[in-house]
Amino acid sequence: MNLPQNKVFCDTSFFFASLCPDDSNYERAGELLKYCKDNNVILYTTWDVISETVTLLRYRADYNTAVEFLDIIKPALFIVPCDDSVRTSAEKVFKKVSKDKRLSFCDAISYVVITHMLDNIPCFTFDKDFRSLGLMVYP
């Protein structure tokens, strides 16, 4: 598999797996993070993904893991600013797609960001929804 050369969008499932040793994707997420660090790959995300990640880590892992994400991983991220037009577009995507597929509103926002603002860059996610939306997904 050819990995991204210079930039990638990161989803909650990727961040969660990278910090939770009990997650089945923990080792793969760690390998991908190391690859990005070694190859200067820019990690893009949104505040919505950060919020979802911190919440998931707090409830499914623990407080310290959530803070570790905020203190160590978040500073290394390029956070894409999302205005109301992104959220309005995400509402349309959610209403169109989520009836037949289990798509969260956060994932709808990510889809709009990736396709309209980031020129369809690849994604690091373990969430099958991204692939079903036609996005390029690793791993």
Regions found by a protein language model. Name each.
Residues 3, 79-121:
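Active-site neighborhoods of divalent-metal-dependent phosphate/nucleic-acid chemistry enzymes
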Residues 22-23, 60-64, 76, 80, ...:
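Residues at alpha-helix boundaries and the short loops/turns that link adjacent helices
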Residues 38-43, 76-78, 118-121:
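Short active-site oxyanion
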Residues 8-11, 45-46, 103-105, 127, ...:
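Histidine- and aromatic-rich ligand-binding microenvironments
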Residues 1-7, 112, 117-139:
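Acidic, PIN/NYN-like endoribonuclease modules and their adjacent C-terminal/linker elements
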